[in-house]
Design a protein with these regions (language model features):
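Active-site-proximal beta-strand elements of phosphoester/diester hydrolases
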Residues: 3-15, 41, 99, 112, ...
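Conserved hydrophobic/aromatic positions in well-ordered beta-strands
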Residues: 7, 101-103, 213, 232
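Hydrophobic residues at beta-strand termini and immediately following loops
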Residues: 9, 113, 133, 196, ...
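Cys-nucleophile CN-hydrolase/nitrilase-fold catalytic domain and related Cys-dependent amidase chemistry
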Residues: 18, 27-105, 172-191
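Short, acidic/polar
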Residues: 20-29, 148-155
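Conserved residues at the C-terminal ends of beta-strands
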Residues: 43, 48, 116, 168, ...
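CN hydrolase (nitrilase-like) catalytic-core segments centered on the catalytic cysteine
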Residues: 64-84, 149-232
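Active-site catalytic loop in hydrolytic enzyme cores
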Residues: 91-160, 174-180, 184, 188-191, ...
């Protein structure tokens, strides 16, 4: 059996407190690495929090990798795991994007995905590229939060050979909250989806009830919500594309 151990970092990120969030990510990644995980997934915009622009603006956003991401890459190399990191970025022509960076076990930046459906992010441009990331022979499509709202992005990943979907998100219940979209994407594509959500309350949205999930064939196999940061670990059978774990192993931070 080819077993994949995955850690979802269900984090209490604080909008606009970059240093706090970076320290939280580093702490959580180190703890997750102690569980011998293969992948670590953070929520959408884990570095900045969701509604950061209302507090600190956007002038601080850098081209990547910046100094912190280079230091973080060194950490990733030292713990020998793969990381999906949600972080704003500035392109070399000055556009801003809501991006997930994929770092390999060697600490190398091997892929990026810019959020396609950025209409609700008033500070960011919409990405255009939809290419699965190859992680050790496994092709992974990245659905950033509302990119799961319609079938466009997920179907594109499927057509390009994706075998697993991951969903770094900041999406809680309430007005315009998730309403079966994640489940439907797994039905549309036949692919499993691992959703890494978050907790906390931002300027105008709340995530206390937001759920991190493992979904297959339209069914929620695992779910977690909490009022504090937590590392959620589970095992996945890559050969049969089936869940091994009966529940998340939860470690609170």
């Amino acid at each position: 059996m080819r077993r994949l151990k995955i850690a979802l970092l269900h984090l209490l990120s604080i909008a606009g407190d970059i240093k706090y969030n970076q320290n939280l990510i580093e702490e959580a990644v180190k703890l997750a690495a102690g569980k011998n995980v293969d992948w670590i997934i953070t929520p959408e915009l884990a570095v900045s929090g969701l509604q950061f622009s209302q507090k600190i603006g956007v002038d601080w956003i850098n081209e990547q990798p910046d100094e912190w991401l280079r230091t973080f890459s060194t950490l990733v190399r030292s713990i020998n795991t793969n990381v999906f990191l949600g972080c704003p970025e500035k392109s070399d022509t000055g556009e801003l994007y809501n991006t997930v960076f994929v770092l390999s076990r060697k600490g190398e930046l091997i892929g990026t995905q810019r959020k396609i459906s950025s209409i609700t992010d008033n500070w960011s441009n919409s990405g255009t590229d939809m290419v699965p990331v190859d992680l050790g022979g496994i092709k992974v499509g990245i659905l950033i939060c509302a990119d799961a709202f319609t079938n466009k992005v997920a179907d594109t990943f499927l057509s390009k050979g994706a075998e697993i979907l991951v969903g770094p998100s900041s999406w809680g219940p309430g007005l315009h909250g998730p309403n079966g979209e994640w489940e439907q994407r797994t039905i549309d594509t036949g692919l499993p989806l691992f959703v890494c959500n978050r907790t906390v309350e931002d300027e105008s949205v709340t995530f206390w009830e937001a759920e991190s999930l493992v979904i297959k064939n339209g069914k929620r196999l695992l779910s977690h919500k909490s009022v504090h940061s937590a590392i959620l670990t589970f095992d996945w059978d890559l050969e049969n594309m089936e869940l091994i774990s009966s529940d998340f192993e939860v470690q609170c931070l």
